[in-house]
Amino acid sequence: MFVEDKNFSWSSKYNPGTDKPFIMSRSKIDLYLKCKRCAYLDMRLGIKGPKPFPYNLNSRIDYLLKVEHDIAREKKEKTKYLEECNIDAIPYSHPDLDVWREPFKAARYHHKETNIVVAGSVDDLWEDNQSKKIHIVDYKSTHTENFEKLKNFDAPYLIGYKRQAEIYAWILSKLDLDIHQISYFLYVNATLEQKTFNNKLDFEYALIPYKMRDFNWVEDTIIEIKNFLETNKIPAATNDCELCKYMHKFFEFIKKKN
């Protein structure tokens, strides 16, 4: 069972030389891989970027999907998604699952070499009926006219979702779960067929499999981030970082005005 460790806290920034573990969320790893300057400002200096827009409707859909799966979990049977897609698995039961799903508790692994606690909140887990291995499952909701194209799961922006699954897989493998190489994205899409609102939205869905890479890259990245956070030099801006480009133009404008 999960026991809260009082030595762990969601620190605002990393303090070099401290013996207190630093909790690093899955999103911070992703931030580091996207833009090292933004990651340094965030994790080392405590200067956060703008908060993402709150996707309240998406959160509600996630909640309802979890309820559906929890009903099936209690009965030890498939959901309609697993049944209709011929996936031989059922929602996985574990005493810590509710904790692993909760954002500010989450699934955590203390990487002793770096003294970093890596944390991530999973949406769901399925157990393969044959191998008994565990599938990582993530819920996604959207509205797109190109849902068929999305199902190919090869757009460049989706790399973040793929990394997300692999980070969860790494954490849970360290918590002694036998992880299946195939993870699933349960995507729901608001349909184009609906012509009027009538206080509801109609959705179609797709269950998209993703064959994960060897997720041991996560540990290499954690060690890299640890060394990165120990330095005192702010990295150069990343060319394709929208926030860095905005800040560059902003300061150029201020200089001209002054």
Annotate the PLM regions.
Residues 46, 140-145, 190-192:
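Short connector loops/turns at beta-strand edges and beta->alpha or beta->beta junctions
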Residues 109-163, 218:
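Non-catalytic protein-protein interaction segments used by genome-maintenance enzymes to assemble
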Residues 40, 126, 135-139, 180-187:
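A structural signal for short, well-ordered beta-strand segments and their strand-loop junctions
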Residues 15-18, 23-24, 171-258:
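Metal-dependent nuclease catalytic regions and adjoining charged, substrate-binding loops involved
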Residues 54-55, 147-159, 204-211:
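Short histidine-centered catalytic/ligand-binding loop motif
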Residues 161-173:
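An active-site-proximal "capping" alpha-helix that borders the catalytic cofactor pocket
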Residues 1-133:
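Metal-dependent nuclease catalytic cores that hydrolyze phosphodiester bonds in DNA/RNA
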